[in-house]
Amino acid sequence: NQVNYIDLYSCFPSAVQIAMRELSLQKDDLRGLTVTGGLPYFGGPGNAYVMNSIATMMDKLRSNRGTFGLATANGWYITKHGAGIFSSKPFEGEWNQATDTTQLQTKIDSAKKPNFTESPQGKASVETYTIVHSREGPNKGIIIGRLEDGTRFLANTEKDPSVLDYMCNNDMLKTSGVVSTDGKRNIFKPIQ
């Protein structure tokens, strides 16, 4: 609530939706979700978007002394996150960068996580997925799923046009199927 301006990284709608959910923001937040207009629309080079969002944020903060702004960034498959809180108000107190991250890493390492198998077999369901496209259209699906016992796995779909069409036009989350290995890779076959 102390943040006056927000710029959520916006490479895809899902990146904005995930950030909104994690920050408990509503799509009609009166502060807006971007100070630039969003990555596809701001008029600058895409590979320097966050630099531009920070620069735009600084202009807003300098025009409204004492306010705060949040700019976020992410990369890869939304697995690398960055966030910055900015203000024209000087920092008060002593700032120290953490030099020993051992305790933090130990806490992360001890968090409960599912077992993982590289050779899944049997009935399974989709936990999350994406569709890889080529110039000709959908090429294959990538599935992160769970076996019946909760073990997590990674698999591809076959290059079956009907499966890919189904994946493009339906929500595959929690879809049941069967997963097996063909010796080179894991294959998930949904039950449609």
Model-derived regions: residue spans:
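Phosphate/pyrophosphate-binding loops at sites that engage ATP/ADP/AMP, CoA/4′-phosphopantetheine
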Residues: 1-2, 26, 162-166
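Beta-strand segments within the central parallel beta-sheet cores of soluble alpha/beta enzyme folds
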Residues: 1-10, 29-37, 64-74
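Alpha-helix initiation/capping motif
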Residues: 12, 26-29, 160-161
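Conserved beta-strand-centric core segments of catalytic alpha/beta enzyme folds
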Residues: 14-18, 40-192
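Flexible glycine/proline-rich, aromatic-decorated loop/lid segments
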Residues: 17-39
